[in-house]
């Protein structure tokens, strides 16, 4: 297991606490002129897997000073019923932001529900409008995991303008947004995927390698330039020979740390910062709702 005292390890929990402290201070200042609403977490049907994420989000919200409400809708709820409930939350001025927990039941079209969340309450950055805005360098309400990956790059102290970055993985919610976020900051980004002829050819020249594929230990030390930063977004459940389930990233951390200048552990790396980005998006949402005049009635 990675030793977080190693200077090469970027401790996501420490980054999270630093971010949340700053967010709390800014929210307290914002609340002096306009009341800050609550975050509403929506789960469709019970799920032990979701409960872990909800607890982490609730804990971070408490640290940031944000009211947090968890609601669980029936697993049998129809698509239209869910959209009506989301519309009601959109219209409720006491609701700052809406979080749609995943996975959802098979009969629910998750993208349709994400599209139903008003962009100014889309604290996850998952509404198509929010993702599309990134193309125009409006990066303040970005998908949380993508924003967290960029924040981890910042934690290295490497200047983003001109930085050579290789993004391995091109999903709609991580890989592609990461590429656009970094390009908005002036980085030179190469995106690799399953049809890339030689991922290693690209990764070995990169100052930063970011990985989000979902394949345990895909990246070894032979694929990394000495001194490069390695940001591991992958989360994989692997059963070892003793029958014990372990959480592994897409990077062989123990081997790669001997080559890398910086590396994120799994767990405890990008994950905690993703939750902090959710709270930062909530702060941004509040400011934009104030600017749009949504909160004037609540202020009065």
From Swiss-Prot:
Subunit structure: Homodimer.
Positions contributing to NADP(+) binding: 169-171, 235
CDD domains: NAD_bind_m-THF_DH_Cyclohyd
Gene3D superfamilies assigned: Leucine Dehydrogenase, chain A, domain 1, NAD(P)-binding Rossmann-like Domain
A Gene Ontology term for the protein's cellular component: cytosol
A Pfam family that the UniProt record links to this protein: THF_DHG_CYH
Signal peptide boundaries: none
Protein name: Bifunctional protein FolD
Record carries keyword Oxidoreductase: yes
Pathway: One-carbon metabolism; tetrahydrofolate interconversion
Keywords carried by this UniProt record: Amino-acid biosynthesis, Histidine biosynthesis, Hydrolase, Methionine biosynthesis, Multifunctional enzyme, NADP, One-carbon metabolism, Oxidoreductase, Purine biosynthesis
Entry similarity comment: Belongs to the tetrahydrofolate dehydrogenase/cyclohydrolase family.
E.C. numbers: 1.5.1.5, 3.5.4.9
GO biological process: L-histidine biosynthetic process; methionine biosynthetic process; purine nucleotide biosynthetic process; tetrahydrofolate interconversion
UniProt entry tagged with the keyword Oxidoreductase: yes
Gene: folD
